[in-house]
Amino acid sequence: MRQVLQKDKRDVQLSKALSYLLRHTAVKEKLTIDSNGYTPLKELLSHNRLKTHKCTVDDIHRIVKENDKQRFHIKTLGADEEWICATQGHSIKSIQPSDEVLVPITEASQLPQELIHGTNLQSVIKIIESGAISPMSRNHVHLSPGMLHAKGVISGMRSSSNVYIFIDCHSPLFFQTLKMFRSLNNVYLSSSIPVELIQKVVVKGNLKDEEKLDTLRRILHERNIPLEKI
């Protein structure tokens, strides 16, 4: 049992190291990375962040296969040259993925029934007040095709999210305003989303900060955006 726990802990550490390098710092760390976000696996394994954990090719294969959010993808070039990428979440500006890794969404028939941005109480207030859901330091806004743990929903929001912003996929403004893509792990990625495309805001659980809740109620009411609790 103890060995299993240690293995799980090590896999979490390796997954975090992979995310850090592939999403954010590959260029800074002078790793080869192409415009789709792929890095040679052998080169990645030589980096100190992975060498510290004595990471092997088998470790990487296991993490890619078993990661519950399918954060990583491996492709093979030639006979045995493997390259790995993070499926989304990048802040590296030189990454401009082709439709090999990001499928352009250009018509309503390509959209799921729901598109939801998961966040928290403090952040949703900032979003409404600023007028848009912004990618912040990342390249895209992340959207999930449903609530956490719903059928077919792998990723797209943090498990700690307790506020859900539903996007109006049927608005005439949707394709006029947004550039939308779908990632390899079925996360929908967008440019900045104006609040005019917010269909409703749903708060989950019993949030105790009544002052912030009152602020949220007020600013949503001012913009005619419904607020629901579940």
From Swiss-Prot:
It comes from Saccharomyces cerevisiae (strain ATCC 204508 / S288c). Its EC number is 2.7.1.160. SUPFAM superfamilies: ADP-ribosylation. One of its GO terms (molecular function) is tRNA 2'-phosphotransferase activity. GO terms for cellular component: cytoplasm; nucleus. One of its GO terms (biological process) is tRNA splicing, via endonucleolytic cleavage and ligation. Pfam families: PTS_2-RNA. Belongs to the KptA/TPT1 family. Present with 672 molecules/cell in log phase SD medium. This is tRNA 2'-phosphotransferase. Catalyzes the last step of tRNA splicing, the transfer of the splice junction 2'-phosphate from ligated tRNA to NAD to produce ADP-ribose 1''-2'' cyclic phosphate. It is an enzyme of class 2 (transferase). It comes from the Eukaryota. It catalyses: 2'-phospho-[ligated tRNA] + NAD(+) = mature tRNA + ADP-alpha-D-ribose 1'',2''-cyclic phosphate + nicotinamide. Keywords: NAD, Transferase, tRNA processing.
